[in-house]
């Protein structure tokens, strides 16, 4: 075998191997990380994450997760299904672009206990309360289509003299073309 054929063979094997690794990590690695590694990371915040099933297609950049639940001292967020489609090549234009973000039957429950602690307080750092950051990011964010289907929101405050509870059901909402990219006049486009 001559030298050019050997180099072509080795290059071909490397390309096929990288494509195979990318495919396996996309189809199996990312769903495994969502279901098993992310919950371990959230334990540091005294939170639990459960995802019944997660699927990712590394070629279309679509993520689907079913029966996701995030709990802290009490239930915080759950949804029947999350659909997310990314446009990863927009990052070369300094833009994080989400093409589709859909939540099917999301439930958000905000609760304040008798000690005036919210059920999401675990995610808020006390260090950030005193520092101000006036820097602007050079990376923009775009959300092309967001949809909430049959959502619900509830708020409960047990810290008041008379406990307060409110809830909203059957929330349907759709949002298109949200973008933080600045236009020619240096104003954000909303």
Model-predicted segments: where are they?
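Surface-exposed loop/turn segments flanking beta-strands in extracellular/periplasmic regions
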Residues: 120-128
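Short acidic/polar N-terminal linker immediately downstream of export determinants
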Residues: 45-48, 129-135
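Conserved small/polar residues in nucleotide/adenosyl-binding loops
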Residues: 189-190
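N-terminal type II signal-anchor transmembrane helix
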Residues: 1-46
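Short, flexible N-terminal segments of the mature chain
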Residues: 169-173
């Amino acid at each position: 075998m001559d030298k050019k054929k050997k180099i072509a063979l080795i290059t071909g094997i490397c390309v096929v191997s990288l494509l195979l690794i990318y495919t396996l990590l996309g189809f199996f690695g990312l769903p495994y990380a969502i279901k098993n590694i992310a919950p371990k990371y959230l334990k540091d915040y005294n939170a639990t994450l459960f995802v019944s099933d997660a699927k990712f297609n590394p070629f279309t950049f679509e993520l689907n997760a079913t029966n996701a639940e995030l709990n802290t001292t009490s239930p915080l967020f759950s949804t029947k299904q999350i659909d997310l489609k990314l446009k990863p090549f927009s990052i070369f234009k300094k833009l994080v672009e989400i093409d589709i973000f859909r939540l099917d039957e999301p439930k958000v429950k905000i609760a304040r206990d008798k000690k005036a602690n919210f059920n999401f307080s675990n995610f808020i750092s006390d260090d950030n309360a005193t520092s101000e950051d006036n820097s602007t990011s050079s990376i923009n964010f775009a959300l092309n289509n967001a949809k909430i289907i049959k959502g619900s929101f509830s708020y409960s405050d047990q810290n008041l003299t008379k406990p307060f509870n409110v809830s909203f059901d059957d929330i349907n909402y759709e949002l298109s073309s949200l973008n933080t990219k600045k236009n020619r006049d240096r104003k954000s486009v909303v």
